[in-house]
């Protein structure tokens, strides 16, 4: 966390530490608002300014090459629900706002065509992240899986999109559950927890 200022020395340190490209993104935003893939040192400051329009905190992340995966999860009424994994294939530079909401700009493949051991590891890491961050309700944990099969957690979407075309509802349906059943679980679990 930094003040809303950055000097040339900071830019050079970012490039030295993380290399290029990097992702500059707000810490609290949705739908990829304020996210920029930065390919040159000169573009870091404008990307930082853009990210600060969405949040008081920003993240600067190494660009990890690989396949993007998302895994939805819910713990309700004492049971873990880990939904089928989705592979996100953006036809743009990355899975930005346009790729998310413009038909034909991305493919979301549920269930993802991945090796069983990678699926098991993503499920394990999703549950670990959910519990470590004390999440409540339904979340989506996003990963990059390198060509060597190593997963990197890139973010936890604590309020994932829940429209009919969003990733988690697709995962829920693939798991054989209706959205109504999912919402009932969330409401009942919240009601029971708040009564304790």
Model feature map: region roles:
Residues 1-8:
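Short, small-residue-biased leader/transition segments that mark boundaries at the very start
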Residues 9-14:
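A short helix/loop element that forms part of the nucleotide-sugar donor recognition site in Leloir-type
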Residues 15-33, 56-65:
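ATP-grasp fold ATP-binding core
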Residues 32, 107-109, 164-168:
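Short small-residue beta-strand/loop micro-motif enriched in glycine and branched aliphatics
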Residues 37-40, 175:
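A structural signal for short, well-ordered beta-strand elements
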Residues 39-121, 145, 150-152:
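Phosphate-binding site of ATP-dependent enzymes
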Residues 115-196:
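ATP-dependent carboxylate activation and anion-phosphoryl transfer catalytic cores
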């Amino acid at each position: 966390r930094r003040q809303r200022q950055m000097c040339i020395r900071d830019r050079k340190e970012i490039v030295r530490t993380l290399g290029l490209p990097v992702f500059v993104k707000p810490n609290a935003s949705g739908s990829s608002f304020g996210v920029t893939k930065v390919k040159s040192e000169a573009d870091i400051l404008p990307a930082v300014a853009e990210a600060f329009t969405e949040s008081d905190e920003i993240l600067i992340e190494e660009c990890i090459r690989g396949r993007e995966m998302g895994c939805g999860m819910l713990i309700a009424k004492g049971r873990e629900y880990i939904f089928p994994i989705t592979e996100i294939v953006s036809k743009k530079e990355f899975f930005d706002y346009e790729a998310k909401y413009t038909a034909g700009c991305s493919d979301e493949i549920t269930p993802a065509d991945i090796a069983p051991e990678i699926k098991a590891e993503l499920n394990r890491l999703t549950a670990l992240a959910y519990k470590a961050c004390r999440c409540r309700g339904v979340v989506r944990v996003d990963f990059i899986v390198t060509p060597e099969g190593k997963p990197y957690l890139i973010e936890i979407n604590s309020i994932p999109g829940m429209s009919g075309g969003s990733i988690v509802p697709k995962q829920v349906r693939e798991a054989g559950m209706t959205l109504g059943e999912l919402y009932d679980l969330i409401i009942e679990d919240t009601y029971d927890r708040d009564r304790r």
